[in-house]
Amino acid sequence: MCIRDRYFLERLAEEYGLAIEYHPKPLGATDWNGSGMHANFSNTTLRTCGSKETYEAICEAFRPVVNDHIAVYGAYNDQRLTGDHETQSITEFSYGVSDRGASIRIPIITVENGYKGWLEDRRPASNGDPYKIAGRIIKTVKSAKV
């Protein structure tokens, strides 16, 4: 959800006397997935490379900077990223094809298209700042040795 969407949602809620809750686990430690703001991203390389090795190199670029990402991915994300409910643990990093429990998911359609497509970072929380999240992802992707 972009900033503009949040603005409209807030104004609509205001008009009806409601409030929006962006907490990633608004019901506390319940047995449900919580609320994330998964970030789908690509660049020219991801859309055209056709190389599993390139995708793996980009994913591996995230491994040493996990804490830098978590720092901007939203408050209380530790309550959502438990390793349960289709999430990886906040202290772990993984990636995989169509793996909804990974930190970064490589969509199956990307693989079916010959490794031409995008990646999905499943760690950002619903209350994260999309600009900070995008900035951190861009910095990491640009640092990848491909």
Role assignments for model-derived ranges:
Residues 14-127:
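Loop-rich catalytic cores of soluble enzymes, especially ATP-dependent carboxylate-amine ligases
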